[in-house]
Amino acid sequence: MSIIFQLALIALVLFSFVMVIGVPVAYASPQNWNQSKPLLYLGSAIWAILVVIVAILNFFVI
């Protein structure tokens, strides 16, 4: 269970780095806003799901 928790945490951290770079770039380019909006919503949903998964796994590990 500890390995699954560590993998989920690594995925969350790496995905957070991607979002930290990707979201400002998407907001800064107004001509691609219609293309970027669904990706931002999808990325936000994936990030939120990863947060919940890490929280649940943290409950079982500790």
UniProtKB/Swiss-Prot annotation:
A Gene Ontology biological process term: photosystem II stabilization
Coiled coil: none
Transmembrane residue ranges: 8-28, 41-61
Stored Pfam families: Ycf9
Membrane topology: Multi-pass membrane protein
Location(s) in or outside the cell: Cellular thylakoid membrane
Predominant location category: membrane
One of the record's GO cellular component terms: photosystem II reaction center
UniProt keyword list: Membrane, Photosynthesis, Photosystem II, Reaction center, Thylakoid, Transmembrane, Transmembrane helix
Signal peptide: none
Protein's job: May control the interaction of photosystem II (PSII) cores with the light-harvesting antenna, regulates electron flow through the 2 photosystem reaction centers. PSII is a light-driven water plastoquinone oxidoreductase, using light energy to abstract electrons from H(2)O, generating a proton gradient subsequently used for ATP formation.
Stated family: Belongs to the PsbZ family.
Quaternary context: PSII is composed of 1 copy each of membrane proteins PsbA, PsbB, PsbC, PsbD, PsbE, PsbF, PsbH, PsbI, PsbJ, PsbK, PsbL, PsbM, PsbT, PsbX, PsbY, PsbZ, Psb30/Ycf12, peripheral proteins PsbO, CyanoQ (PsbQ), PsbU, PsbV and a large number of cofactors. It forms dimeric complexes.
NCBIfam families in UniProt: PS_II_psbZ (TIGR03043)
Name of the protein: Photosystem II reaction center protein Z
Organism of provenance: Rippkaea orientalis (strain PCC 8801 / RF-1) (Cyanothece sp. (strain PCC 8801))
Organism ancestry: Bacteria, Bacillati, Cyanobacteriota, Cyanophyceae, Oscillatoriophycideae
